Amino acid sequence: MAELLLELLSEEIPARMQVRAIEDLTKLVGTGLAEAGLSHGGLRGFVTPRRLTLVVDGLPVAQPDVHEERRGPKADAPDKAIAGFLGSLGLTRDQLETRETPKGPFLFAVIERKGRPTAEVLPEIIYRALTALSWPKSMRWARGQFTWVRPLHSILAVFEGAPLRGAIGLGVSLEGLPVGFIADPAAAPEGTPLLAFGATTRGHRFLAPEPFPVRDFADYAARLRQAHVLIDREERKRVIAERAAALAAGEGLRVKDDPALLEEITGLVEWPVPLMGHIDKAFMDVPAEVLTTSMRSHQKYFSVENADGTLNARFVVVSNMDATDSSARVVAGNERVLRARLSDAKFFWDQDRKAPLAGKVEALGARVFHAKLGSDLDKVTRVRAGAAWLAARVPGADASLVDRAALLAKADLTTGMVGEFPELQGLMGRYYALHDGEPPAVAQAIRDHYSPVGPGDACPTAATSVCVALADKIDTLAGFWLIDEKPTGSKDPFALRRAALGVIRLIVENSLRLPLREVLGSAISTYGDRMLAQCGKADGTSSDVIEHDLIAFIAERLKVQQREKGVRHDLIEAVFSQGGEDDLVRLLARVSALADFLASEEGTNLLSAYRRATNIVRIEEKKDGKPVSGDPDNALFEQDEERALSLALDTLLGEVSPSLAAEDHAAAMRALARLRGPVDAFFDRVTVNADTPALRNNRLRLLARIGTAMATLADFSKIEG
């Protein structure tokens, strides 16, 4: 068994593309090996900013020989049919055999194909993988037809300790002919730009740029380490995290946890060397979030915190150089660059506070929210109306505070700081509002009205924040539904799925008793008759359609959210599909009670009985060609089990309605559980298909009534399992 080592050395690959690229390359080469019939012991992929590396263990030195038999047409088939069979295999008539079969004599082809040496097959597999690898962005160079994310410098391809034979044509020959894979580089047309497979690589761009040969993966990894390259991404990540933490701990500090930044920096360096620098004290009065964001987004520095979580005037930079002798110069250079960056941030901070936040609201009129939905100022007007409607319905909400927060919520979008750092929207509004003397509840709502932005984000709980956050998200959903800009498939350019999940969390986590139809209807009405007319939605029917469609959309997002929390989606569907239920708190309470009921022995058995009853009714309806309708006639009951079941159903209906009205869902389920005994007894002792037609029809009506009674709690036909 032999080993294949493949390395593609290029200019720097963007960090965000690296992991996907090595995964795709591994998959493409693996597929090529399988198609070529080459078994192996596994593929391992490695990626650095400049190289994609793949090692395949346990390869055979040659493909297996192939023995294959193909049955063709009958021996006396027309010549045209036989010729077609021969043409498909590339054989002649004398190479076929005639064999007797139970269906008569048939022609057979016996194909013997000797396996090719693996060293001949691998270059073709590699070429196909390279040309099939898709990058989000790619480029050509020289006279290139071949594309790669960045100019490709070399291809190391070593099998059994020797370089594979072959090359990739990077463009066209002097005659203008396109060039692809070349099995023999020496035979390539003169002047053809080639990238030949070889057995050499290079180390760190600056610390070890000279080429050196390698024999196998062990030699490759060891020599690259000597050449200041760690090819294992996880090792580089671990080195960065551990050494940065050690630097901070040596000062009694800690590195601010930032997994995304750690991932990005891992893709920027081949030889990570964390170093600690200082932030000029003159910038420490700027909000910590601004400093952290500037260091993170512009410089890729880790922030450093004190033991209490406050920002310290230190940072960690990860150098791509072995800075043993020059670490002081590296740190000083980074501190100098950071001072320039933070000077800009401090300028915005000082300038933005010279005018009150309220004075910036009118400037929102110059910002387009959406071409069909008006400006950001138009959105603020709608959000104020929606928030006022909610303030009258959210417990503890102060209408004046809610209105003020809604008015100022988007004002920081016009500031220099948010223009430079859009991710600080809302947060800067809070700082500026507090500076202006706005009430803390208003400032908090300005910050929180974008939340929650993801499943891990905290959900606002303060009444003022909840009103503004909910009004903002509902307005967004209503507006984009109004202009038919809905999510399709995997595309959701306006983050409407996230907005819907935000609506769900705000309502459910704050136990808000808000009928969705009323909430959505109020939001749609804020667009005004003129806007509705422009969108062709002026009539009430169209508005109702939007409400219905939006509720269905929110219901789907609710299923996704609850499924991720371990709740069965079919139970949500069973409750939601009854129609008329748009109170999410009540709906989930009923779903929870239904889940508990179905987990019990009574629930499991009653569900089976329900299915048995509905199946019998459906089968008999099909036989009769008409639906079972009407209530059973008590006078036709002949057995005690019929009477007991009918009485149990009457009792159930009498108990369920008051329980549901009181939102005592557990009591409703207990009432349902008491139906099990009469149902089991009925099926044990009563023959539904009685000889007398009237008796049979009456018993079918009684069975149908089981489904009708249970449907007052949920649509049990939607329940799976």
UniProtKB/Swiss-Prot annotation:
GO terms for molecular function: arginine-tRNA ligase activity; ATP binding; glycine-tRNA ligase activity. It is found in: Cytoplasm. Its EC number is 6.1.1.14. Pfam families: DALR_1, tRNA_synt_2f. NCBIfam families: glyS (TIGR00211). One of its GO terms (cellular component) is cytosol. Tetramer of two alpha and two beta subunits. It comes from Rhodospirillum rubrum (strain ATCC 11170 / ATH 1.1.1 / DSM 467 / LMG 4362 / NCIMB 8255 / S1). InterPro entries: DALR_anticod-bd, Gly-tRNA-synth_bsu, Gly-tRNA-synth_heterodimer. It comes from the Bacteria. HAMAP family: Gly_tRNA_synth_beta. GO terms for biological process: arginyl-tRNA aminoacylation; glycyl-tRNA aminoacylation. PROSITE patterns: AA_TRNA_LIGASE_II_GLYAB. This is Glycine--tRNA ligase beta subunit. Its main location: cytoplasm. It catalyses: tRNA(Gly) + glycine + ATP = glycyl-tRNA(Gly) + AMP + diphosphate. Keywords: Aminoacyl-tRNA synthetase, ATP-binding, Cytoplasm, Ligase, Nucleotide-binding, Protein biosynthesis. Belongs to the class-II aminoacyl-tRNA synthetase family.
